[in-house]
């Protein structure tokens, strides 16, 4: 699955050229033209409104200058790229969470029940405070991972894993609470709340989900 694949002209493909399955050395990255012989794609929409491609490679050949970096050392480059990608989507996610927080607070100020705004109910105030706390924790972790990007690979990887765990957990919590506090309209097509929740759900799966990065953080 290649997110954004329908708009790509070239693909970066990882392939093992030597060694055993679990060896770090022996993996290389290649630039492959999407129109090359042996490359086939099937485009489809994703749940968050984006597009992706299913890519199949069959007997594809590339020239020697298609390799990125030194032969057999592509895993380090790939891992660095993933960590930078995590930092970027963490920043995107906190923007979505802020929007959901703001929209929920505004809705609870205007929606009335029993003659008063539902935002005056203490139990709902507590839930909105919890949403805000999850957002603030995510902001802090996003700052942290961006500050660690230029450090050594181990520090960068641990920061990226920690941030991805926080973003995944907080994004799900904030999205669920926003939908519930908006009531039945929370998942309607006309309201953007449900669309932001879908995007946060997709972000959790990109570059590895919470479970994957918990294990990565523990091993760092």
Predicted regions located by residue number:
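Structured core elements
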Residues: 11-14, 31, 40, 54-56, ...
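Glycine-rich phosphate/pyrophosphate-binding beta-alpha loops
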Residues: 1-4, 47, 187
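A short, charged helix-loop
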Residues: 53-81
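Residue-level signal for inorganic ion chemistry
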Residues: 30, 55-57, 97, 138
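Alpha-helical interface subdomain recognition
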Residues: 77-220
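A short core secondary-structure module
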Residues: 1-41
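A generic structural signal for well-ordered coil/turn residues at beta-strand boundaries
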Residues: 6-9, 23-26, 35, 50-56, ...
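Flexible, small-/acidic-enriched active-site or ligand-binding loops
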Residues: 33-63
């Amino acid at each position: 699955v290649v997110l954004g694949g329908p708009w790509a002209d070239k693909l970066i493909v990882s392939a093992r050229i030597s060694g055993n399955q679990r060896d770090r050395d022996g993996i290389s990255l290649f630039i492959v033209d999407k129109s090359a012989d042996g490359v086939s794609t099937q485009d489809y929409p994703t749940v968050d409104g984006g597009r992706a491609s299913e890519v199949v490679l069959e007997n594809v050949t590339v020239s020697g200058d298609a390799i990125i970096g030194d032969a057999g050392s592509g895993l380090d480059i790939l891992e660095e790229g993933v960590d930078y990608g995590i930092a970027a989507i963490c920043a995107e996610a906190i923007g979505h969470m802020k929007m959901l927080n703001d929209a929920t607070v505004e809705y609870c100020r205007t929606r009335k029940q029993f003659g008063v705004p539902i935002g005056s109910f203490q139990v709902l105030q507590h839930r909105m405070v919890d949403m805000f706390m999850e957002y603030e924790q995510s902001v802090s972790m996003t700052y942290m991972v961006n500050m660690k990007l230029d450090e050594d690979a181990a520090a960068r990887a641990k920061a990226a894993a920690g941030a991805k765990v926080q973003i995944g957990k907080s994004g799900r919590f904030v999205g669920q609470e926003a939908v519930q506090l908006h009531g039945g309209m929370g998942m309607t097509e006309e309201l953007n709340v449900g669309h932001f929740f879908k995007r946060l759900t997709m972000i959790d799966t990109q570059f590895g989900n919470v479970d994957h990065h918990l294990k990565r953080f523990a091993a760092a």
